[in-house]
From Swiss-Prot:
Residues 518-527 have a biased composition (Gly residues). One of its GO terms (molecular function) is single-stranded DNA binding. Its main location: cytoplasm. GO terms for cellular component: cytoplasm; DNA replication preinitiation complex. Has a role in the initiation of DNA replication. Required at S-phase checkpoint. The gene is sld2. This is DNA replication regulator sld2. It is found in: Cytoplasm; Nucleus. Belongs to the SLD2 family. Residues 60-226, 244-303, 340-527 are annotated as: Disordered. GO terms for biological process: DNA replication initiation; double-strand break repair via break-induced replication; mitotic DNA replication preinitiation complex assembly.
Amino acid sequence: MASLDVSDIAAQSAQLRAELKEWERAFAAANEGRKAERSDIKQAPEIAAKYKEYSRLKSLEKSVRYEKKHNPNSVNLEERPKKRKHASPPGSHEARLESTPRKAAKGPFTTPSKPRGHPSEFDPYDSPSALRRLFSPSTHQQSSSPLKTAIGPTPQRDGKALGLFDLLSESGGSTATPTAARLASVRGAAAQTPSKRKTLDTIAEEEEEEDGPRGDRTPASASKSYMLSALFATPTTWRYATMMDNRNDAIRREPSPQPSANDAGQGAPESETPAFLRRSNSARYAASNPNGEGLSPINVRKRPRFVGKGLSALVQGLRDMEEEHLDNELDVLREIEAEQAGMNTEATDSQAVEQDTVPTFKKKGQKRTTRRVRMKPVISKPKCESQLPASEDEDNTDNVDQSDDELAAVPETQQPGASGDETNGVPDAASLHSISEPELDSDSDYEEQSKPPARSKSFSERIRDAIGVVEPPPAEKQEKPQPKVKEKQTKPRERKVNPEAHANYRSLKLRNKNSKGRGAGRFGRRR
């Protein structure tokens, strides 16, 4: 196939293409204009074979044209030395030539399908070729562990691990600086950690060649090889600054046609500052060489960022809009209320004061904590006065005077119609206690409330009165006739009132007052 010319391959591919187009038109006419799909092509083995042959010829034509364009003095594939002659059985070369070749490599300007990582995340020194040579078994044939020189915190020098006291030796021992001849001997025997590109290029490696039309790698142009070796990925800040400084020094060393004194004075102090101490090398390069032609700065490719607003900013904006809308509505509502209030107000003179329409609200406080007692007038029977042994004339005159004065003092507290026998006789047991008759609970109580309540006697006074009444009168008084006394006692007696006694502080026995049953009082006390 290597001897075939590009024109022959193009003629064969054009003939196959014409046959395939004719079959596609016939298929579309037979199937109502439907185009042939992959399943339809697989059902026709002859057409499928033609499709495969056509794709093989197109890829072969492309590879041959690419080789002639980039490497016109290339050696034929048959004349190239084979890498492993013992591995290929006889006759396999012809069979491999007849087989379908692999897909041709993409051109240098084609877009890669999916990169493994972003170029900004790579170090320009860690190229794939360096890693492939570092971890290839052919490079470290005599090393026990090739990863020993690449991974680990152990200090190393020229691929050998340094001991604790190796740095103290100055006598040209194992730690002395190796010469060029020693380096040449060590490189082939021991594994080395690649430090620079030059060291990696000196590692001996067998040429990897394959038998077939795509045996060697695609030759790259000078610009592409430089970009891959020097600027494989986005350069770091330190490397880019170094490049700018080197270019600066090269431009500064060239003699300028008319150097001025100001330029010389400004260039001297800038050259004294080291590159790693300068703040911005790119700004310094632009200021010192405004018209110089140097390396254009390479734009650092960064990951795309979201240019628009974030979610929180959008939510906050919506909230602000809603609050502004609510504020406007509230202002309008307040204006309407103010207008209505102004229309409803009238003149103060035309308004009539209405006092009885709405009762004033009074907040209720604590209820009554003490029992309210409504005292009623108590009528007690008068006691009989003790008669002293004196002359009848004196007693009669005194009694008449006293009775007249006392009756004038308290006339309304005595019951009318009291018989004189009751005054002389022994009082009943009810005289010891206050009289509370059920008849007093009737409506007549309200009539008697107009009268001033009389002071009730205390318990000790009543006992004293009862004892004084029970005492038998002396025999002399009983033997004497008392017609005058009986006539005088028909009049109501006065009632003694103690001014210090209080009407509310006395024991009351209101048995039938608000009682639902015998013995159940207001608070349900047991008697």
